[in-house]
Amino acid sequence: MIKVTGYAAKHSYSRLKPYEFERDEAGAHEVEIDVLYCGVCHSDIHQVKNEWSNTVYPCVPGHEIVGRVTKVGPAVTRHAVGDLVGVGCMIDSCGQCEACKEGDQNYCGSPNSWLATYNGPMNPRAKAGGENIYGRDNTFGGYSNVLVVKEDFVLKIPAALRPEVAAPILCAGVTTWSPLRRWGVKAGDQVGVIGMGGLGHMAAKLARALGAEVTLFTTTPEKIEEAQKLGFKAVLEKDKQAFEKLEKSFDFILSTVPEKHDLNPFVALLKQDSVLAVVGALEPLAPLDNMSMAQMRRSVAGSLIGNLAETQDVLDFCAEHNIGPEIEMIRIQDVNDAYKKVEKGEVRFRYVIDMASLKEEIAGA
């Protein structure tokens, strides 16, 4: 067994604190990773606070992980000691269902769904034969110094990407990339992005690199200014005049807002046969005006993270096009304060934990 130190929440109202636990040694098809960086995702906060009612405690968050391979199992062929690698939201799936066979591990149809990098199976209450099919009820994520992961769920970090910049691409990047590719965004398309946070600004950068014309929708003048600094057109959500001018203008709209909000004003902006995809909010949204949708044959759809191939694809695309998230580096000791700032929308645009700060804490203990 490997002795590991991480930061964990013990219950829904607790601060993240140092937590010691053990991981299994790398098996035949697994790699051991020295964690270098881990992004802070809004879903980390949702899970720590049990806002989706599926958290298993103790909860060690973190699924935007970049590190270096330190050991490999005897059957590993995809990675070698010394490789710079990444781990995103998943560390396993059943591999047998139709979705998995098609390469869509993120839509695994097994009773437990896919195995999350932290907080156990995506559906921890489902049982197959009385037990979770993965043989475990909890998993611990990247807010820790060591990770052990099945080689197929480990991504290669391109040399052209700074490792700390690569970390958020493993969730925020692929979560926005997957719907952009699924609905065929291409050069010349008019694309709207709702929200100017960690996901929103990445979606805008990726869509622009695909050749689309991008408009960001946000809620404050400050965020309008931020969007313009990044070279994007931006519209205040409360500007009714601007919305009227933009009716039937967009080929695709992506909503990245991580909470309940009204999509109806944005549906009216879609052209005929166009799609508004939601990636930010997993809770119920405001009711949709089906008349507006039916009259123009518009669609509202959902999308959940991305599969492994899409994750490697977006990493490579970002490296090729020199794209990356805007990040702020923090020490792990400051993660609780970082959570508060994320909730207030004060981060520009993604916090990344320098895990050297955890190693310094361990060494000084």
What role is predicted for each listed range?
Residues 37, 88, 254-256, 355:
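Short, well-ordered coil/turn residues at beta-beta hairpins
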Residues 24-38, 51-101, 105-106, 114, ...:
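Glycine-rich beta-strand-centered segment in the early N-terminal region that forms part
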Residues 274-275:
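Glycine-centered, small-residue-biased loops immediately flanking beta-strands
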Residues 280-297, 308-314:
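Rossmann-fold NAD(P)-binding glycine/threonine-rich loop
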Residues 94-194:
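NAD(P)H dinucleotide-binding glycine-rich loop of Rossmann-like/cofactor-binding domains
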Residues 187-196, 201, 205-263:
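Adenosine-nucleotide cofactor-binding segment
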Residues 1-2, 209, 308-365:
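C-terminal hydrophobic helical "lid"/dimerization subdomain
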Residues 270-271:
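Helix-to-beta-strand junctions that scaffold the AdoMet/dcAdoMet cofactor pocket
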